[in-house]
């Protein structure tokens, strides 16, 4: 899946400082001549791909990035100080787009990659530059060049093979933390997860990327809760892992709530390959496990796996099932691509 996280950002490079109009004034020197220094250069605006980030959430709280302008020139041929630049730190996989959200300025695909977004203005010349044989005392200096101001979009594309679905507090983050190197926030209350978390999951010598999607509630496709903004991103997953809280009073109702949201959202979301699992079985006795798993299987029409993200019971079986579905989905996609690219007379 490709998570698209958009952020609108306003940037402005620094303007150049104005050149100085100044004359040498020293004792016993009657005609000192011009000594005005140049203005400092304005700061640049850069974007850099860094490690350790997987979201553009920081740009939600700060949208304006302005570099400093260069200082004005001074007497005694002193050049003004250059303005400080600004660097936007973004995750790898971020696209930089023009204001139209279509034209790509840069694609940040490697750690350490830097791209200049707005160049600072040059500083203006001081009057020292305008001295000539016919004008020994010029009273002229150049203003600095203005900075560049523009509006850009940042669009993050993170790749995940499988997405975790479930109601809030279904144990998705615990499962991801138990099976991968991800460390999502975990607590015993709903909506602990506020944005997707990615983790690399290993099983039987193979790896795939799994995303923990914020919990969905009834009416999420209409904008309720916090899951509506992620339903479109889940649509791009190859496989969905639907975790149902085994401690819930009615597991079938919980299952159908998520299924209804997928169907109401439209598209191919409801028909996407899906693995259903009964979670938190460590809190159930054998009879409760069997009854709830049977009810869930009858409602879904597919085999239902059982697991506990806390104790680890059944986790490997679930991962293997997800791995098989991912392989099947990729093979089907490759077959479709071959059909699309086949020559037609």
UniProtKB/Swiss-Prot annotation:
<feature type="binding site">
    <location>
        <position position="173"/>
    </location>
    <ligand>
        <name>Mg(2+)</name>
    </ligand>
</feature>
<dbReference type="InterPro" id="IPR027417">
    <property type="entry name" value="P-loop_NTPase"/>
</dbReference>
<keyword id="KW-0963">Cytoplasm</keyword>
<dbReference type="InterPro" id="IPR006073">
    <property type="entry name" value="GTP-bd"/>
</dbReference>
<dbReference type="Pfam" id="PF01018">
    <property type="entry name" value="GTP1_OBG"/>
</dbReference>
<protein>
    <recommendedName>
        <fullName>GTPase Obg</fullName>
        <ecNumber>3.6.5.-</ecNumber>
    </recommendedName>
</protein>
<dbReference type="InterPro" id="IPR045086">
    <property type="entry name" value="OBG_GTPase"/>
</dbReference>
<dbReference type="InterPro" id="IPR014100">
    <property type="entry name" value="GTP-bd_Obg/CgtA"/>
</dbReference>
<comment type="similarity">
    <text>Belongs to the TRAFAC class OBG-HflX-like GTPase superfamily. OBG GTPase family.</text>
</comment>
<dbReference type="GO" id="GO:0042254">
    <property type="term" value="P:ribosome biogenesis"/>
</dbReference>
<feature type="binding site">
    <location>
        <begin position="166"/>
        <end position="173"/>
    </location>
    <ligand>
        <name>GTP</name>
    </ligand>
</feature>
<dbReference type="GO" id="GO:0005525">
    <property type="term" value="F:GTP binding"/>
</dbReference>
<dbReference type="InterPro" id="IPR036726">
    <property type="entry name" value="GTP1_OBG_dom_sf"/>
</dbReference>
<dbReference type="InterPro" id="IPR006074">
    <property type="entry name" value="GTP1-OBG_CS"/>
</dbReference>
<feature type="domain" description="Obg">
    <location>
        <begin position="1"/>
        <end position="159"/>
    </location>
</feature>
<keyword id="KW-0547">Nucleotide-binding</keyword>
<feature type="binding site">
    <location>
        <begin position="191"/>
        <end position="195"/>
    </location>
    <ligand>
        <name>GTP</name>
    </ligand>
</feature>
<dbReference type="GO" id="GO:0003924">
    <property type="term" value="F:GTPase activity"/>
</dbReference>
<dbReference type="GO" id="GO:0005737">
    <property type="term" value="C:cytoplasm"/>
</dbReference>
<keyword id="KW-0460">Magnesium</keyword>
<dbReference type="InterPro" id="IPR006169">
    <property type="entry name" value="GTP1_OBG_dom"/>
</dbReference>
<keyword id="KW-0378">Hydrolase</keyword>
<comment type="subunit">
    <text>Monomer.</text>
</comment>
<feature type="binding site">
    <location>
        <position position="193"/>
    </location>
    <ligand>
        <name>Mg(2+)</name>
    </ligand>
</feature>
<keyword id="KW-0342">GTP-binding</keyword>
<feature type="domain" description="OBG-type G">
    <location>
        <begin position="160"/>
        <end position="327"/>
    </location>
</feature>
<feature type="binding site">
    <location>
        <begin position="279"/>
        <end position="282"/>
    </location>
    <ligand>
        <name>GTP</name>
    </ligand>
</feature>
<dbReference type="InterPro" id="IPR031167">
    <property type="entry name" value="G_OBG"/>
</dbReference>
<comment type="function">
    <text>An essential GTPase which binds GTP, GDP and possibly (p)ppGpp with moderate affinity, with high nucleotide exchange rates and a fairly low GTP hydrolysis rate. Plays a role in control of the cell cycle, stress response, ribosome biogenesis and in those bacteria that undergo differentiation, in morphogenesis control.</text>
</comment>
<dbReference type="Pfam" id="PF01926">
    <property type="entry name" value="MMR_HSR1"/>
</dbReference>
<dbReference type="GO" id="GO:0000287">
    <property type="term" value="F:magnesium ion binding"/>
</dbReference>
<feature type="binding site">
    <location>
        <begin position="308"/>
        <end position="310"/>
    </location>
    <ligand>
        <name>GTP</name>
    </ligand>
</feature>
<feature type="binding site">
    <location>
        <begin position="212"/>
        <end position="215"/>
    </location>
    <ligand>
        <name>GTP</name>
    </ligand>
</feature>
<keyword id="KW-0479">Metal-binding</keyword>
């Amino acid at each position: 899946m490709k998570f698209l996280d958009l952020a609108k950002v306003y940037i402005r490079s620094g303007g150049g400082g104005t050149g100085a109009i100044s004359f040498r004034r020293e004792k016993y020197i009657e005609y000192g001549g011009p000594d005005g220094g140049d203005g400092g250069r304005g700061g640049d605006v850069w974007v850099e791909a860094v490690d350790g980030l997987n979201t553009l959430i920081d740009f939600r709280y700060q949208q304006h990035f302005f570099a400093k302008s260069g200082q004005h020139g001074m007497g005694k041929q002193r050049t003004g100080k250059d303005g400080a630049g600004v660097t936007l730190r973004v995750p790898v996989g971020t696209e930089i787009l023009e204001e139209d959200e279509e034209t790509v300025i840069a694609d940040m695909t490697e750690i350490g990659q830097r791209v200049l977004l707005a160049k600072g203005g040059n500083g203006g010349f001081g009057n020292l530059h305008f001295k000539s044989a016919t004008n020994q005392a010029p009273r002229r200096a150049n203003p600095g060049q203005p900075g560049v101001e523009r509006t850009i979009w940042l669009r993050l594309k993170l790749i995940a093979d499988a997405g975790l679905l479930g109601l809030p507090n279904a144990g998705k983050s615990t499962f991801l933390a138990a099976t991968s190197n991800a460390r999502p926030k975990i607590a015993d209350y709903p909506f602990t997860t506020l944005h997707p978390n990615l983790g690399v999951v290993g099983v039987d010598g193979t790896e795939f990327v799994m995303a923990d999607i914020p919990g969905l509630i009834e009416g999420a496709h209409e904008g309720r809760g916090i899951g509506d903004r992620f339903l479109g991103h889940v649509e791009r997953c190859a496989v969905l892992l639907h975790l149902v809280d085994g401690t819930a009073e009615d597991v079938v109702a919980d299952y159908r709530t998520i299924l209804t949201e997928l169907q109401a959202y439209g598209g191919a979301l409801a028909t996407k390959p899906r693995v259903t699992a009964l979670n938190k079985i460590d809190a159930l006795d054998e009879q409760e496990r069997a009854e709830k798993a049977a009810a869930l299987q009858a409602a879904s029409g597919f085999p239902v796996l059982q697991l506990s993200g806390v104790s680890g019971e059944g986790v490997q079986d679930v991962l293997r099932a997800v791995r098989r579905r991912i392989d099947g989905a990729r093979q089907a996609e490759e077959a479709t691509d071959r059909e699309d690219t086949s020559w037609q007379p």
